[in-house]
From Swiss-Prot:
Keyword Transcription among UniProt keywords: yes
Note: Present with 1010 molecules/cell in log phase SD medium.
Domain of life of the source: Eukaryota
MF terms (GO), sorted A to Z: transcription coregulator activity
Function: Transcriptional regulator with a general role in all morphogenetically distinct forms of filamentous growth, namely haploid invasive growth, biofilm formation, and diploid pseudohyphal growth. May control FLO11 gene expression as part of a promoter-bound complex with FLO8 and MSS1.
Biased composition (Polar residues): 417-445
Keywords noted in UniProt: Nucleus, Transcription, Transcription regulation
InterPro entries reported for this sequence: LIM-bd/SEUSS
Record flagged with keyword Nucleus: yes
Organism: Saccharomyces cerevisiae (strain ATCC 204508 / S288c) (Baker's yeast)
Protein name: Morphogenetic regulator of filamentous growth protein 1
Principal location listed in the UniProt entry: nucleus
Length: 458
């Protein structure tokens, strides 16, 4: 604390005698001060000091004014903290209360409070999660997107190195529980030249589908992604998109099939997938050269292979009538029967549908979609505490009929089309009606039957 300007000593203290070069030396070498030294030496003169407001005069120590007393007070420790965006600890996370914030008295407002009040107000429509992600700096959001990309590559590596575990249900159950959230939804669509299929699965049935691949002869899977992009959205999710992804399924005889697809989905902040959408648009079956060599070197099949090659070398095969082409009126190669017979020796061509998947696996996926749709029925049975599944189904249908009159049309269609609340299956020419118009029960039943036929169609 400042004590004011220095003051001269009192008059009772004698001042020393200043000896200069003109002072004659003393014979005994001692300096004796004359008795009149105090009278001959003038007192020390100090410069005039400008007093502070409220400083008393008269050579006493000045007293601080009321403003200085407020300024000199120690800061007070308060337990009130600002929001998580302003009060952060050393690790960058929101403070938990272990680091107190020192706030001066009311005469000197805190600069953080002034900056917070001067900031522009945020829109009311934004949610709390959106506001928190909007405040996150760009380098933090970029860091989270890179983490999601590394997580996706880690998942792909787990699938690619799962040789010998494709048919194990325990392996897929553990892997999928680590990848997806419990309420995640997986959509898988297939497109051919003449048809389009769409499936939706919930997490409990998805391991069954993956383990079914091993029971149909697949020994190894390989996933390749190109042009992978990730981005942190304002709703605290990390979106990823891969327009070029290939799924390769290998069979033990050396044949394989490649599915060309597009994939997109979203991670949460725990780096678990909330939803996944895979769309397959084409496929190409292929055979490795060593598989052809094994077939040609097999003595038990040499006679059959020679007959197939003899059919392929016939010169007049184009002139002969093809029963398959005549009955189906389709453009097929003239040696289609020989090619079909040669394909039968490889697993990749056995019972393959026009979607590039075996018919048995297509049925399993269809049943899994139906079971996923029955999730709402299972919830209804648990809520109503009904033991019999048949009784629960009847009560669920009756409750659906009662609620169908007051439910909007677009809500009926969404509820009847699938389980995912994030998607709708109205089709490309569908027009969702957002008005609250009511339909009779017969119209609702017709809509339900039409949608059920579309979902159950093979």
């Amino acid at each position: 604390m400042y004590q004011g300007p220095p003051q001269p000593p009192p008059q009772a203290v004698p001042m020393p005698y200043i000896v200069n070069n003109n002072t004659p030396p003393y014979p005994n070498g001692n300096i004796n001060f004359p008795p009149t030294a105090q009278q001959n030496i003038p007192p020390t003169v100090y410069p005039q000091q400008v007093p502070f407001p409220g400083q008393p005069q008269g050579g006493q120590f000045p007293q601080p004014s009321s403003e200085q007393q407020v300024f000199n007070q120690l800061p007070q420790v308060t337990q009130t903290f600002h929001n998580s965006a302003q009060n952060t600890n050393a690790t960058g996370g929101p403070g938990s209360g272990s680091m107190p914030m020192f706030t001066p008295v009311a005469s000197f407002p805190h600069p953080m409070a002034t900056a917070a009040t001067a900031a522009a107000p945020l829109p009311r429509s934004a949610s709390q999660a959106s506001l928190s992600m909007l405040r996150v700096p760009y380098h933090v959001r970029k860091y989270l997107s890179n983490l999601a990309m590394l997580k996706l590559y880690e998942i792909i590596n787990e699938v690619n190195t799962a040789m010998g575990k494709i048919g194990l249900l325990s392996f897929w159950t553990e892997l999928i529980s680590d990848i997806f959230t419990p309420d995640a939804v997986i959509r898988y669509s297939k497109k051919s030249m003449t048809d389009y299929r769409e499936f939706e699965f919930i997490i409990p049935v998805f391991p069954v589908i993956c383990s079914t691949l091993g029971r149909f002869g697949i020994v190894r899977m390989e996933v390749k992604v190109l042009q992978l992009k990730t981005q942190v959205l304002s709703n605290s999710t990390i979106f990823f998109n891969c327009p070029r992804v290939t799924f390769v399924y290998y069979y033990p005889d050396g044949s394989y099939i490649t599915h060309f697809s597009q994939m997109k989905g979203a991670f949460d902040l725990d780096l678990k997938i909330n939803w996944l959408d895979v769309s397959m648009h084409s496929f190409v079956p292929d055979i490795e050269w060593n598989a052809v060599e094994r077939l040609l070197s097999d003595d038990t099949k040499s006679t059959e292979i020679e007959q197939i090659f003899r059919k392929l070398k016939q010169e007049d095969v184009k002139e002969q009538g093809n029963s398959f082409a005549e009955n189906n009126a389709t453009n097929v190669p003239p040696n289609f029967e020989a090619i079909t017979q040669l394909r039968s020796y490889f697993d990749v061509f056995r019972n393959v549908s026009v979607f590039g998947t075996q018919e048995g696996l297509m049925r399993v996926m269809q049943i899994s979609t139906v079971m996923s749709t029955l999730k709402n029925l299972r919830k209804f049975q648990i809520e109503k505490n009904i033991d019999s599944p048949v009784t629960a189904l009847s009560a669920y249908i009756d409750a659906d009929k009662k609620d169908s009159g007051s439910e909007p049309l677009h809500a009926k269609r969404r509820r009847n089309s699938g389980i995912s609340p994030r998607t709708t299956t109205l089709g490309p020419n569908g027009n969702s009606n957002t008005s609250n118009e009511e339909l009779p029960t017969s119209d609702v039943n017709d809509i339900n039957k039409d949608m059920t036929k579309k979902k159950m169609k093979f």
